[in-house]
Every structure is written in structure tokens, then in C-alpha cells.
């Protein structure tokens, strides 16, 4: 029996919490039962549907915004161009320069807006969770970044020269290479994708758990506990609202960091023999 079939779904938002009990955050929220397609490699669960929905929404936004572009942008076109210019100027060109920034702009832009859209689901009512809180999407995005920066380095230098330039620190005594080469190898080819993946997942997972905890506690204090305990619902809902705004900051910060580090790793691969 598949894991999704063994775990019952608990939606921990205040809109679905049972009226007579309090549920603390659990793993059930991250492994909901399948919907629509119930078996095989194309099984769909709630998080997968959210992932598809947010991808469609962000694509639709840019299609509609740029459908009839004007010389002087306004409305949705203005918002879309500002967002695209932010990625182009502050990430791609800032790290890679204009020529290489233009070359890798599609990849960096795609990563940035996929992360933003997926993260945004964590504060949208009735969705209440980011697909990035589960390992699948961060793993795919980290793998994409990993493939791109290694491909770039191998294409420019060849496999062996690229690997050698990435892990051999020039100008150090020979005995130190026995210490530094393994460290550089692990840092470049293992820790880079691993930290990209874990940083994104851990931040969105922590944010989801905090919001669930505060709003579930608010529901419990106001509608379940009764009596004097209801007063504790006030600080819990204030904390929940405050952390919602903080989560909004984290949503964009994580997208920026992921896209920025992808650009940095591409830059390091392009100049592997200079580091």
C-alpha cells in the first residue's frame, strides 16, 4: 500500500478544523491521500494539484500581461515588466554580466517565478501550504541548477579540466591538496545542490508549521476550550497575522536566494580556472 493511502489527510486550517478537537501539526498534512488519479507514477495528491495550479496561474499572469504590450506599460504589463526587470538586472546581469546574463536569463527567471508561485500558496486561503514544503519540488529545482552549472563548465573546459579547476586550489603546498581536494569536491558537487534543496524546503516547512500552529491554537482557544482560556486566542491570532506577513517576506527572499545562488554557481563554473 502506498504511503499516500496509509496516511489520512488532516487540513489544519481554521476552516476545516474539527469543532470538538485540536490537531497539532503532523506529517499527515504533507502526505495527503491521492485525488483524481489514485495509483501509478502519475498519482495526484493535494500538494501536486497546488503545484500545478500555481504553475498555471503564474504562466497565465505573464501571458495575459504581455498579450497586447504597450510602449508605455501600465496595469498588469507594468507589474510583469517590473518583476522581469528585477530578475534580469538584480540577479542575472548583476552576477553574470549583460552578455552571460542574457544567455541564462530564461533559466534564472523560470526558477525565480516557480519558487515564488509555489511559495505563495502557503498564505492563500484554502491552499495553506507550499508544495516546496515537501522535498519533491526543491529537489527538482536544485537538480536543474546543478545540471545547468555543471553543463556550462564542462562545455567550456571539458570534463576533466572543469573538475580539476573546481576542486584543485592553486598555489597551495602539495600535502594540503590531500585535505583541500576532498573538501572542495564535497562543497562543489554535493553541498551546492543539497543546500539549495534543503534551504528552500526547510524554510517553507517551518513557515507552514508555525502558521498552522498559531491559527489552529486560535481556533481552539476561541471555539473549543471555552471559559477564561478564550483570552489566549487573542495573542495567538496576533502572532499568526504577524507571521503571515513574515512568511510573505520569506516567500520572496527564498526565491531571490535560490535564483541568486544559481547565477553564482553558473558564474563560478564559467570561470572555474580563475578560482
UniProtKB/Swiss-Prot annotation:
Q: Does the UniProt entry include the keyword Cell inner membrane?
A: no
Cited Gene3D superfamilies:
ATP synthase, F0 complex, subunit A (1.20.120.220)
This entry carries the following GO cellular component terms, namely:
plasma membrane; proton-transporting ATP synthase complex
**Molecular-function GO terms, alphabetical:** proton-transporting ATP synthase activity, rotational mechanism
Q: Which UniProt keywords apply?
A: ATP synthesis, Cell membrane, CF(0), Hydrogen ion transport, Ion transport, Membrane, Transmembrane, Transmembrane helix, Transport
Membrane-traversing stretches: 46-66, 104-124, 135-155, 166-186, 204-224, 231-251, 252-272
In the UniProt record, the signal sequence range is: none
The superkingdom listed in its UniProt entry is: Bacteria
For membrane topology, the record states: Multi-pass membrane protein
Instruction: Indicate where this protein resides in the cell.
Output: Cell membrane
Any S-S bridges, and between which cysteines? none
Q: Which InterPro entries match?
A: ATP_synth_F0_asu, ATP_synth_F0_asu_bact/mt, F0_ATP_A_sf
Q: Which Pfam families match?
A: ATP-synt_A
Q: What does the record give as the function of this protein?
A: Key component of the proton channel; it plays a direct role in the translocation of protons across the membrane.
Q: Which NCBIfam families match?
A: ATP_synt_6_or_A (TIGR01131)
Family per similarity comment: Belongs to the ATPase A chain family.
Query: What does the subunit comment say?
Result: F-type ATPases have 2 components, CF(1) - the catalytic core - and CF(0) - the membrane proton channel. CF(1) has five subunits: alpha(3), beta(3), gamma(1), delta(1), epsilon(1). CF(0) has three main subunits: a(1), b(2) and c(9-12). The alpha and beta chains form an alternating ring which encloses part of the gamma chain. CF(1) is attached to CF(0) by a central stalk formed by the gamma and epsilon chains, while a peripheral stalk is formed by the delta and b chains.
The identity of this protein, by name, is ATP synthase subunit a
Amino acid at each position: 500500500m502506498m504511503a499516500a493511502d496509509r496516511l489520512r489527510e488532516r487540513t489544519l486550517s481554521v476552516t476545516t478544523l474539527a469543532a470538538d478537537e485540536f490537531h497539532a501539526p503532523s506529517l499527515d498534512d504533507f502526505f495527503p491521500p491521492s485525488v483524481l488519479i489514485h495509483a501509478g507514477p502519475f498519482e495526484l495528491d493535494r500538494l501536486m494539484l497546488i503545484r500545478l495550479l500555481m504553475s498555471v496561474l503564474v504562466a497565465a499572469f505573464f501571458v495575459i500581461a504581455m498579450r497586447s504590450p504597450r510602449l508605455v506599460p501600465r496595469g498588469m504589463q507594468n507589474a510583469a515588466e517590473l518583476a522581469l526587470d528585477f530578475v534580469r538586472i538584480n540577479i542575472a546581469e548583476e552576477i553574470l554580466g549583460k552578455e552571460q546574463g542574457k544567455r541564462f536569463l530564461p533559466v534564472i527567471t523560470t526558477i525565480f517565478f516557480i519558487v515564488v508561485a509555489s511559495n505563495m500558496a502557503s498564505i492563500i486561503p484554502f491552499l495553506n501550504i507550499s508544495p516546496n514544503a515537501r522535498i519533491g519540488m526543491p529537489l527538482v529545482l536544485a537538480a536543474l541548477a546543478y545540471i545547468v552549472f555543471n553543463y556550462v563548465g564542462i562545455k567550456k573546459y571539458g570534463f576533466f579540466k572543469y573538475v580539476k579547476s573546481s576542486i584543485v586550489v592553486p598555489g597551495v603546498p602539495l600535502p594540503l591538496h590531500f585535505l583541500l581536494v576532498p573538501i572542495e569536491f564535497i562543497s562543489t558537487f554535493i553541498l551546492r545542490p543539497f543546500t539549495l534543496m534543503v534551504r528552500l524546503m526547510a524554510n517553507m516547512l517551518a513557515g507552514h508549521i508555525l502558521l498552522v500552529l498559531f491559527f489552529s491554537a486560535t481556533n481552539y482557544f476561541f471555539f473549543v476550550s471555552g471559559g477564561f482560556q478564550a483570552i489566549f486566542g487573542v495573542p495567538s491570532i496576533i502572532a499568526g497575522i504577524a507571521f503571515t506577513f513574515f512568511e510573505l517576506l520569506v516567500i520572496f527572499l527564498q526565491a531571490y536566494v535560490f535564483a541568486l545562488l544559481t547565477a553564482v554557481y553558473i558564474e563560478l563554473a564559467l570561470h572555474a580556472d580563475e578560482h
